[in-house]
Amino acid sequence: MPKKFQGENTKSAVARARKAEAKAVADAKRQKEIEDAYWQDDDKHVMRKGQRKEDKEKKRLEQLERKKESQRLLEEEDSKMKGKPIKPAAPSKVTRAQIEETLHREEEEKAISEKPKTHLEIPLEENLNRRILEEGEVEARTVEDAIAALSMSKELDRHPERRMKAAFTAFEEINMPRIKQENPNMRLSQLKQLLKKEWMKSPENPMNQQHATYNAQ
């Protein structure tokens, strides 16, 4: 009696089919990930390459703009030195660094031009070497000259206050520069007060000479 044919186990077949399908899905997914990673790396490479090209072009344009600006400033400086106006250049793109550099240079030039003068550079508010001679005033450059010129008149000798003004003028011209140098921060009125104090005690003061003569007698 022949053996009865036994068919394939249905459950085993289904399990193998599912396993094969899952493997196929996993393989397809893994392959897709590999391809995506490849194209992603390729995209990054392209982007980096494009960025480098863009940066290079940007630097080239900035260098060109700086060169144009430097040339314009050089021509402008040459024109100022020669005293000839130049034709204004067409406005060009200037970088922020160039603007800051130009402003910094202008501020330095302005600071140098506005540097405060020292007391030696500032002229006296009153020219002590040029005075208008008033009626009856004797012109003298030194105290000795003033006294010699005025002592020729016995009338004036009897009245030293009349030659006081000329003697004080000579005294002021001699001593004011020294007082001003010793006190550079004082105003002219303060300097004159110091000068007057010295004058009141000075032997060159005709009034002091009169007192000295009287005391000697």
UniProtKB/Swiss-Prot annotation:
Keyword ATP-binding listed: no
Describe the subunit structure: Associates with translationally inactive ribosomes in the nonrotated state.
Region of interest called Disordered, as start-end residue ranges on this chain:
1-95
**InterPro entries per the record?**
Ccdc124/Oxs1, Ccdc124/Oxs1_C, HMG_box_dom_sf
Q: What is its main location?
A: cytoplasm
Please report which protein family the annotation says this sequence is part of. Belongs to the CCDC124 family.
Any one GO cellular component localisation term in the record: centrosome
Fetch the PANTHER family from UniProt: COILED-COIL DOMAIN-CONTAINING PROTEIN 124
Keyword Coiled coil attached: yes
Task: Tell me the protein's name.
Answer: Coiled-coil domain-containing protein 124
Q: Which domain of life is it from?
A: Eukaryota
Function summary:
Ribosome-binding protein involved in ribosome hibernation: associates with translationally inactive ribosomes and stabilizes the nonrotated conformation of the 80S ribosome, thereby promoting ribosome preservation and storage.
Q: Where in the cell is it found?
A: Cytoplasm, Cytoskeleton, Microtubule organizing center, Centrosome; Midbody
